[in-house]
Amino acid sequence: MQLAETISFWSAVVLYALGFTFFVVGMFFQKMTVTSRAVIFCSIGFAFHTTALGVSWIQTGYPPFVAFFESVAAAAWFGVLGYLILQTSKPAFRSSGVGVCGTVVLLLGWASTPSYAGGALSASLQSVWLFIHATFATSAVGCFLVAAGVSIQWLWKRNHNNSMGEEFNVPS
């Protein structure tokens, strides 16, 4: 990455993260002025994001859709573009930026990690057991995520209602 692209990219990430934070605070405390500031952070972040993609396009000579970083950054850019158009035309959807900005920060963070360029598998990994292992490991992570989500929901309801009802009888 060129210096201009790097500065623009990380400025966008920081602004999206600030936007996400303001969205969360605005939604939690039901303050539309805070949510409006979040939209401003998101819009400025979008300008920096556009600059980063433009510099990348100029530097490489092709649209930023080929490498992993480029394709994820472009997908995030389109997501923010869609959100900005939506919240401009339908202000009632302004708070949906909490999901957009949060996801975009995660995607851009993921895209900026070391190379995900695919290569040939080594002979020791060319086995049906790799597929079986990856399937079960991924399924286990999914189960842990579901369990964590149910646990958070259970704790939230228990602490705020003091009655769980029949649907939350959890075996322990």
Regions picked out by a protein language model, each given a short descriptive name:
Residues M1-S172:
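Polytopic transmembrane helical bundles with strong interfacial aromatic enrichment
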